[in-house]
Amino acid sequence: MSQQKKYIFQVEEGKEGSDGRPSVGPVYRSIFAKDGFPDPIEGMDSCWDVFRMSVEKYPNNPMLGRREIVDGKPGKYVWQTYQEVYDIVMKLGNSLRSVGVKDEAKCGIYGANSPEWIISMEACNAHGLYCVPLYDTLGADAVEFIISHSEVSIVFVEEKKISELFKTCPNSTEYMKTVVSFGGVSREQKEEAETFGLVIYAWDEFLKLGEGKQYDLPIKKKSDICTIMYTSGTTGDPKGVMISNESIVTLIAGVIRLLKSANEALTVKDVYLSYLPLAHIFDRVIEECFIQHGAAIGFWRGDVKLLIEDLAELKPTIFCAVPRVLDRVYSGLQKKLSDGGFLKKFIFDSAFSYKFGYMKKGQSHVEASPLFDKLVFSKVKQGLGGNVRIILSGAAPLASHVESFLRVVACCHVLQGYGLTESCAGTFVSLPDELGMLGTVGPPVPNVDIRLESVPEMEYDALASTARGEICIRGKTLFSGYYKREDLTKEVLIDGWLHTGDVGEWQPDGSMKIIDRKKNIFKLSQGEYVAVENIENIYGEVQAVDSVWVYGNSFESFLIAIANPNQHILERWAAENGVSGDYDALCQNEKAKEFILGELVKMAKEKKMKGFEIIKAIHLDPVPFDMERDLLTPTFKKKRPQLLKYYQSVIDEMYKTINAKFASRG
């Protein structure tokens, strides 16, 4: 039998715990950094250099594109070249200086992804300003907090977000003095701005302010902060993560090394669809990598229902997604299959089993079944535009059944990554054609050191033969601290190691499996500790539910859950079992609840979960957990305190009912 490949090597020994600190496992590094970490490209000391050097090298390459609207209908993508974008950026920078914006001022950007978003960001980069994205999904309270906390003096804003921005007034106007619309400004908006002591400009009007003026660009250092990204914590106020130029240029060097080592290097011919929020580090660094390669970035129209149409028109080569988007793709394909009749499904399932079988034997997705790719799976590829060669999933765990399905049917590499805003995104990423990495986030990228730290209270041992513990990261991609919160910085950054709060398990091939969250642990009344995230990940593999929140507390002896069922599977079950009613009615139906609970219990037993980890009651909510009700963060992480508050009466009723049943049994 051939020896298993290992994608990491050890650089330091592990250490036993001492002085109240837990033990730590060995320090590991990517095999692609065997001869040291890659140096950033010569002359590339800042984010501005990333763009400037590409303008010099690829002036006529298409850079930013958006769909042309002709007679109210979307047409082809229309492009601005690197040189054209540079010329606008220089004008915008001159305008910023002409209205008195000083070095290291904080500049807010508020709105959905667009060419203007990137142009505003590059103008900040040119003049050494701190770019502060204002979350499109956080609402007025958080936007007001970020403007005031980071002392934002000027905001670039999407036209339809102007009214939202004004809701932060007058509190935000202590610092915010100037507003620039990505589009036009109405007379009423000008008047409203005046009442708050603000000056508001339309995009073209603001650009004219810099005409005929020339300001010297300041020298940018690697250590300079280029952006403060506020992360939406699951509790408390957002934290301002300071990202330096060095973090981003180091990350780019690591991505170049990784993709070259995996024979998937980026080129000028690559095309990217920009739809994941630029206010998140995931999309920001991907776009920086594309800009560094002189590649093209096309923007979506801002509507998730039209995303597939935009994909078909743009034909991207790299498609980045969060699991929610890929879950939708998976559910849509499953529905098409079951609606297509027995024969169609039989052919598809046979083709799937055949190709997956050969991939399990070590063949690449290209070699496993070219015939079935052409006859059966090509339609899936066409649905993503026809040119996608890599799908990269990040921000949250991707369910294994979705990942394995897409690896077979999408005719491209499906990779899962892991990173935090604090680590400048990319920290781990799985590798092309390595089926053994299914369900993991892959090995480390070649610019960080990784070690696990034991978590004794959760019985995770970083020195055990199967090493488990809190993931800790060291390297130049790490953030420079939380803005104005040195206390919080000291909590997570200890001796150069970032403590992520995520619990991981090293796999034999050097990839990392995220198994738990350090803080998501509570005790049941009988004294048993429950690692809730781990349990939710297992229940999340049940195809009959799209999302599940598990709850317990120290006054009760058992767990309960709130779930969003998979509509298609629930309706199919109802039809097969003679249960009537629409989707909303089915979610209230006791038999439907028993069915979903039964599926979860079946999975729990299959995974040999402990008795106290098995859910005893369930409530079905037809409305998915969402940001509108403040139940999720913008990266789709569950806000547990808010979920508890929202579903408190339902939870109380479930416990009352089950406890009454227990009591009646005597």
From Swiss-Prot:
Keyword Transmembrane: no
Residues bound to ATP: I228, M229, Y230, T231, S232, G233, T234, T235, G236, D237, P238, K239
Domain of life: Eukaryota
Catalytic activity: a long-chain fatty acid + ATP + CoA = a long-chain fatty acyl-CoA + AMP + diphosphate
Region spans: Fatty acid-binding: 495-519
Keyword Lipid metabolism part of the UniProt annotation: yes
GO molecular function: ATP binding; long-chain fatty acid-CoA ligase activity
PROSITE patterns found in the cross-reference section: AMP_BINDING
Pathway entry: Lipid metabolism; fatty acid metabolism
Top-tier EC class: ligase
GO cellular component terms given for this protein: Golgi apparatus
GO BP term, pick one: indolebutyric acid metabolic process
Documented EC number(s): 6.2.1.3
Keywords: ATP-binding, Fatty acid metabolism, Ligase, Lipid metabolism, Magnesium, Nucleotide-binding
PANTHER family: LONG CHAIN ACYL-COA SYNTHETASE 4, LONG-CHAIN-FATTY-ACID--COA LIGASE
Family, similarity comment: Belongs to the ATP-dependent AMP-binding enzyme family.
Its biological purpose: Activation of long-chain fatty acids for both synthesis of cellular lipids, and degradation via beta-oxidation. Preferentially uses palmitate, palmitoleate, oleate and linoleate.
Protein name: Long chain acyl-CoA synthetase 4
Organism the protein comes from: Arabidopsis thaliana
Gene that specifies this protein: LACS4
